[in-house]
């Protein structure tokens, strides 16, 4: 099976790339700008190019067809329109990575299926993903463009730790705070349910969709079946670090008032209780089951992080903001 990944080195796509490289019968090419290609398996063909330069990519891929094109780095409608122009008639399946944050907010029911309405007034990122889906489904209905839409939720991997909020430089600063006995912020009272999924589990399901005729024209989400409260998530991270984290609970409204850009990630995503019904992916990929519990996966992720000083990026601006918010919230904030 001849496959092209646009991207191929991120949290989600990197795990898929590594798993495919270990399997027979797959001829994988990744197309990206080459900035993160150091750990690509030797069997994977690499093309350096900017997918946003349509003429350049058309020339690079001239004469090539693919069984599957996997798009991991399209975020706005113009990018998927470009892909339709580039790949219509040249691929048998086009898999678009959307987002489970596209689902209705606030939810009318906490159990999410693929038929849950798509609407997110709180986050432009999610609205753009919805618009991308609409473009692709219109192309499927009108011209038969062979799209499959995949909606991940909160997926993590080696070195990436799933937190409710963190600074622009990643999760390390909050991990460091936990290790040093400093408090960290948990939005709300920490009792809302959330789902985190290890990238290796996600990859297994994604690979089962490759070339799958039953997935054409279909949206499907891929998540773990494990539901945890945010308190549990932080406590499990603390256990893996060998510490009891000091959690300070602060309302999402207050956090957004102090940092408006948190509205999307919180009200549009992580402050909602969500439970995913994964019946559809299990029907499309018989035998799939997310098998990595969070307490297992996060230990592996933290072990990787501790061995990589280049990922241990201090974020003094975020650190100071967290201290400032906790001071402002006291005594209205309560600690666990």
Labelled PLM ranges:
Residues 110-114, 119-134, 154, 164-172, ...:
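Short-chain dehydrogenase/reductase
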Residues 208-267, 278, 283, 300, ...:
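Mid/C-terminal beta-alpha module of Rossmann-like enzyme folds, strongest
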Residues 64-111, 127-138:
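NAD(P)-cofactor binding segment of oxidoreductase domains
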Residues 48-66, 78-81:
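Conserved Rossmann-fold cofactor-binding substructure of NAD(P)-dependent oxidoreductases
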Residues 3-26:
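N-terminal Rossmann NAD(P)H-binding glycine-rich loop of SDR-like oxidoreductase domains
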Residues 143, 157-173, 209-220, 243-244:
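Glycine/proline-rich active-site loop of Rossmann-fold NAD(P)-dependent oxidoreductases
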Residues 134-164:
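Conserved beta-loop-beta element that borders a ligand/cofactor-binding pocket
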Residues 174-197:
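A conserved pocket-lining segment of Rossmann-fold NAD(P)-dependent short-chain dehydrogenase/reductase
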């Amino acid at each position: 099976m001849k496959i092209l990944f646009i991207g191929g080195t991120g949290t989600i796509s990197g795990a898929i790339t590594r798993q495919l490289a270990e399997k027979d019968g797959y001829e994988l090419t990744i197309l990206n700008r080459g900035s993160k290609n150091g750990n690509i398996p030797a069997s994977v063909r690499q093309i350096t190019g900017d997918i946003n330069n349509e003429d350049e990519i058309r020339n690079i891929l001239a004469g090539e067809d693919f069984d599957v094109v996997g798009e991991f780095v399209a975020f706005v409608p113009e990018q998927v329109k470009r892909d339709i122009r580039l790949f219509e008639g040249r691929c048998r399946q086009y898999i678009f990575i959307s987002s489970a944050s596209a689902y209705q907010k606030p939810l009318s029911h906490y159990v999410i299926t693929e038929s849950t309405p798509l609407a997110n007034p709180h986050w432009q990122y999610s609205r753009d993903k919805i618009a991308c889906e609409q473009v692709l489904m219109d192309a499927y209905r009108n011209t038969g463009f062979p799209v499959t839409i995949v909606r991940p939720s909160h997926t993590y991997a080696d070195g990436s730790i799933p937190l409710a909020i963190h600074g622009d430089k990643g999760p390390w600063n909050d991990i460091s705070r936990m290790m040093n006995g400093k408090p960290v912020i948990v939005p709300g009272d920490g009792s809302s349910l959330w789902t985190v999924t290890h990238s290796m589990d996600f990859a297994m399901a994604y690979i089962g969709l490759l070339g799958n005729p039953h997935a054409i024209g279909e949206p499907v989400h891929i998540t773990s079946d494990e539901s945890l409260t945010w308190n549990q998530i932080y406590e499990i991270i603390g256990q893996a670090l060998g510490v009891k984290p000091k959690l300070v609970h602060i309302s999402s409204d207050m956090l957004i008032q102090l940092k408006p850009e948190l509205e999307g990630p919180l009200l549009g995503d992580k402050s909602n209780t969500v439970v995913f019904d994964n019946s559809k992916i299990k029907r499309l990929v018989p035998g799939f089951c997310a098998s990595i519990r969070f307490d297992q996966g996060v230990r592996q992720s933290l072990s990787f992080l501790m061995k990589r000083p280049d990922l241990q990026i201090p974020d003094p601006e975020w650190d100071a903001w967290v201290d400032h918010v906790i001071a402002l919230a006291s005594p209205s904030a309560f600690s666990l």
